[in-house]
């Protein structure tokens, strides 16, 4: 046991993925890519639309063998850096150009493979309400199945 909450992150975008994390012992979840593509996110709409329009294959890993490793939108700049296996220079002006200016080639737009499961920019309240309702439904179904003996440890 840990005396601090364990927060699961990576690959969590909806109720079923939230339920999976909780079933594995997480105390909570972080839905990074899902929250970037929310109506309230201050991130530029170009980035949000790259998530909505992208598939799970539209991301690349930069700094795979360096730190910090990052999964990002597969811009031409990111693909070239991944292919060269060169460390990425984190330029704050370039990042600001991506985050708030919408220049998807300027910096790196961090995005997980779960972007392939995001089909709209929605209000956070709607995302969380639906995710929590779906999570509870999945956990109830698993609890019923375990009680009936149709699944076992």
Regions found by a protein language model. Name each.
Residues 1-7, 12-153:
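Conserved active-site-proximal phosphate/metal-binding subdomains
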């Amino acid at each position: 046991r840990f005396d601090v909450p364990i927060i699961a992150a990576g690959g969590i975008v909806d109720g079923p993925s939230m339920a999976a994390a909780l079933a594995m012992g997480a105390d909570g979840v972080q839905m990074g890519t899902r929250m970037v593509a929310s109506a309230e996110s201050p991130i530029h709409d170009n980035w949000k639309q790259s998530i909505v329009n992208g598939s799970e294959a539209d991301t690349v890993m930069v700094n795979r063998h360096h730190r910090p490793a990052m999964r990002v939108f597969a811009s031409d700049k990111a693909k070239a850096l991944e292919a060269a296996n060169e460390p990425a220079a984190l330029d704050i002006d370039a990042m600001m150009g991506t985050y708030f200016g919408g220049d998807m080639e300027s910096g790196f737009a961090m995005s997980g493979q779960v972007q392939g499961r995001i089909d709209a920019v929605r209000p956070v309240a709607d995302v969380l309400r639906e995710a929590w309702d779906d999570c509870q439904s999945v956990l109830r179904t698993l609890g019923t199945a375990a009680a009936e003996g149709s699944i076992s440890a």
